[in-house]
Structures are given as structure tokens and as C-alpha cells.
Amino acid sequence: QVAGNQTNKGVAIICQSGTIGNTISFNHRSLPIGYIISLGNQAKLSIEDTIEYTLKDKRVTAIGIYAEGFTSIDKLIRVFKISKEKKIPIAIVKVGRSKVASETILTHTGSLSGKENIYDALFKRMGVARCETLSELTELLKYFHTHGVISNDQISIMGPSGGDMAMLGDAAETLNLKFGKIKPQIKNDLKKVNHPGVIVSNPFDMQTYNWNDPDNIEKTFKIFFKNNFSSISLMLDFPNMEKCDTDEWDAIVDKFIKVAKKYKNGSLISSLSDTMPKHIRDKCINNGISPLQGMK
């Protein structure tokens, strides 16, 4: 079976495995998918040919690839250059780092996986994001779909939990992302609309003093978005909707979306993939906000 919904624009998925293509279509992550193309052993069409084809479609916002091997490095470099020129980002899961994976690839599609350090260098040079798992791939494609590539490495994150902020600090460091410095005037303005016990920093532990104060929550978001960072995110985990009332969480997300959609660099992050319900993910996507499930 093939799962999914029609979309006016979305990402193109190119796979050397039909099952993996299907698996991506089964996602519970609200990823807008325009194409799923399975190539197998590339006897007729190569990954490079298919990238070139999808780059010609103006509805394609980003390209996600599962690859076991390539047919032409020269052609691969050429289509990567085209993607950069068109500002259509590419994310890839390239398997074959281990001996076991290399042997499996040989029996699966007959591909030679090649030296992975060479691919690492190539992807980095061409601005292609290498992912290790399908979860990483789908989450990154959501970000690419809504925002494209970040303009710099300066980010900011806010949320009601100091523990979440600490974990995100570690996660950001592994990705070579930096928490930008909040300007003094913005810091002073944030202090005016938050409880004296709240320490303004980046990442910003907002705590829950304003949890039921929608006006000050909205003011906090408006002030925080004045920071000139490439990405500004709110971290929030929803309880189980079957057992709990989520009206308070919905209200906070609505305030965040109201502010963030004007700036086109906002994301909503949940620490677990399960703690962001579908109606919230869809609302974010429809308003240009990236709903990111999980810290990586």
C-alpha cells in the first residue's frame, strides 16, 4: 500500500529501496511528500538522473535520498551544483560505512558502496546534509520544506523546562550550532514581561509563570523574535490527548504561530516524536512553521 496525501508542493524522495520509500510514506510526521521514486539497482535510471529530473519541478521544495551507491561522481557533483543554484536543499542517508552494510548492499542492489570518508567530504563541500537514520532524514526534510537552509549557525530556543534547554544545548553542540547572544535591549524587554525569577538567556528557560497569561506569552514571543538568529524555536511537549486536556498547550502554540509566521524562521520542537499531535504538526506546516519531533 502507498500512504500519503496530495500536496501542492513538497519534498521528493529518491530511494534505492522500494521498502524504504514505502516506510517514509508511512511516517507520522506530517512531511509533505510530492514524489517517491524507487530505483533499485539503477539499471535504467540513476540517482543522479532522478535528482536532475526532480530539480526541474518547481513544486519540489527539497530532496531526500536513500543511497547505496552512485553511478557517476562527476554527474553527482553537477546535480549537486544545480541544487545549490536553485536553492533546493538535499538530505541523504548514504549507507555502507560498516563491512556488514557494504556486503548487504552488494547482495541487495549490486552497488559498490565506496569509501565513505570521500562521500563525507563531497557532501560537506557541496552542502548536502548527511543523515544517519530515516528519522533524521524526515525531520531535516520538514525543516528544508518550510525554511530551506539556515543562513548562519546562530540559533535560539525557548521553552518552559530547564531540563529540556540543557539537553538541547548538548544536541546543538554535536551539530556545530551556536546559541546566539541576546542583545541587551531585547534582554531588558524580556525581563519586563516575565517573572523576576526567570533568567533571560539563550537557550531561554521561560518556566511556567506566564503559562496561563496569553498576553505576556505573546509579548515574550514578539520580543524574542527580534533577535537576528537564523532559527528560533519553541520547545513544547503535549500530553496524551486521549487522557488529558490540551487546551492550554494549544493556546500557547497558537500564540507562537501568530508571531512566528511573520518571520519565516520559526520551529516547534518536541523532545519525543510522540509528543506532538497531528493537528499541531499540520497547523505548523500550513503556517510555515517547522514541526520538529525529537531533538535530533
Which residues make up each language-model segment?
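Catalytic-core regions of core metabolic enzymes
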Residues: 1-296
